[in-house]
Amino acid sequence: MTTNTARSFSDKWTKNPQLAFAETLREGSDIQQWILSRNGFASRAALRDYLAPCTRVLDAGCGNGRVTALLRELTPPSCEVVGFDLVAADVARENLRTASNVHIEQGDLLADLSRFGEFDFVYCQEVLHHTGDARAAFLNVAGRVRPGGELAIYVYRRKAPIREFTDDYVRDRIAAMPYAEAHAVSAEITELGRVLSAQ
């Protein structure tokens, strides 16, 4: 992970520790439905049924712990839920301080992950492409899946060339800005996108 990427995610989670947390847990929310549908589940109940036999679940690259909390809600009480993140472990730990049988650690997807052991289900989404070596990170995470277990990953797909160019252009311009300034510029661009989409 580059220094700018690490700084950006550290700022994102430390300055917004509850970002999308409640919405991720709220049944029927757009965020929760997106998480469920992109992983092939029609409902919370379907994911709960899938997770029922799990004894260990990992959220690799857990950010503020919002999906870790969802996994905790949907797994049996005896299931150990582990989350780790390179830059936001403290934020996730604080957000999940009252959750039972949840362990949050600092961890790097590019480092040796054997200390975490093996898991029945490993969730690693919106993370691999930010590591600087997605292939190595994928292989590390895949190595934590027990025989018969499952790995659920999500990486951003490459968009149309003009969109990729625009994303790179904007990212290059705001990368060195202080967080608040970069956030304000991003909010303006997002609003412009909404206005243009509504036309």
Outline where the language-model segments fall.
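Alpha/beta-hydrolase
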Residues: 193-199
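Short N-terminal helix/helix-N-cap motif within the alpha/beta-hydrolase-1
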Residues: 69, 131-136
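Short glycine-rich, flexible loops that bind phosphorylated cofactors or substrates
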Residues: 130-131, 160
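Conserved N-terminal segment of class I S-adenosyl-L-methionine
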Residues: 1-117
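A conserved beta-strand element that flanks and buttresses the S-adenosyl-L-methionine
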Residues: 123
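A short glycine-rich, Lys/Arg-flanked "PGG" loop and its adjoining helix->strand segment in the class I
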Residues: 135-147
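Hydrophobic adenine-recognition pocket in adenosine-nucleotide-binding enzymes
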Residues: 127
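Conserved class I S-adenosyl-L-methionine
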Residues: 150-191
